[in-house]
Every structure is written in C-alpha cells, then in structure tokens.
C-alpha cells in the first residue's frame, strides 16, 4: 500500500509539471532549456532592505502621535530609497524614491492587467509550482523553456525568489511589524497583547508573500532590471501588503 501511495504521489507531481511545461515549451525534442543566468538572490536582498527599514523606523523617536497609513508608507518609501542608494551610490535620490513609490503603490490588479498573456501564463505557472513546493532548480529550468528576453527572465526569477524569502521573513518577523504598526500607525485599534494576537491569527503571510512576489516581478520590469531599485520597490510593496492585512 505504501509503495502504491508513493507511486500515486510521484505520478501526480509529474502530471502537474507536464501541464505547466506545455504552455512554454515549443522546442524540438533535442533542444535544451535555456540556462538561467546566476544573479544575486533578489529575495535575500529584499529581506535585508525590509529589515533595515524596520530598524530605521524603530529607532526614530521624533513622533508624538500616531502616523496615518499614508505617512507610514511615505516613511517606508523614503527609508527604502535611502537604503537602496547606500548600496548603489550612483543612483539619484529623487528618481529612486519616485520609482520605488510607483512600484510599491501599484495595485496588484493593475500589475496583472499590464502583463502580456505570456507573462501571466509564466507567472501563474510559477505561482502554482511554488504553492506545490516544487524545487527552485526545477522552476529555473521551467523559466529557461519559456523563450523570454533577459529582462523577463530576471523578473520571473525575482517573482520566485521574492516569494520564497518573503514568506520566510514574515513568518519570522511579522509579529514585530504588527506590534510596531499597531503602536505607531492609526489603524483604529487599541494597543494590547490580545489585539496583536488576534491580528496575527488572521494575517495570511502566504498571501503577503505572493503579493510581494508580484512587486518583485514588477520592480524588475519597472526599473529596467536594476536589482536594487527593483528590490527597494518590492520591499516597500511588501510592507504595504502587510499593512493592508490589518
């Protein structure tokens, strides 16, 4: 019976991958998938920037009253731009902040509407594989079969890497963010441990991570594949997604 169940699971996994591959693969039988170029992990840099934003916000003691949500996001965008420029000093502060704001405040529905049919198919397939815990190397192989230009390859990788790292980050650090937001941002709740606990129970960090992945994709597309500007926009967008859960 155990052997039968293992065979069934393996068969189902093969079926999922075969279905996903059909949409992209039009190669001949001897054509190999395009090798996806190794680049810095978008998701790791993304988490570093979110963490730096949190520590900068937490260290500030100048406010005497709660911020509005708009003021909070403006501070997050400003801190994201500052952090990005510290990593790439050649960037303009004004243009970087403007691009990060445009990325992070773009509604997800509009991001999807702006995608081509192929973009949506590729991203939907990657999302399906991520939901089914398919190995990252297999997802890279899939991206290599999709006949994408270099910018879209990097954007697709950013989607995958952002989801994986964002989910890890929010599962680990989400409680700190919720506590900070409830204490410092006007979200119409009183501060007590019970309220914070109830918010944590209702938040879906997986949903935040998937929203974040779209910001990762859009960040790379909107910044012309400047990884630091793109990841800065995705980091601010991730915080915006978490804020919208409250």
Model-predicted segments: where are they?
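Bacterial N-terminal signal peptides that target proteins for export
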Residues: 2-11
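Intrinsically disordered/low-complexity terminal segments and short unstructured peptides
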Residues: 4-5, 17, 38
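C-terminal motif of bacterial Sec signal peptides marking the signal peptidase cleavage site
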Residues: 19-23
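Hydrophobic, gly/ala-rich membrane-insertion helices/peptides used by toxins and envelope proteins
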Residues: 187-246
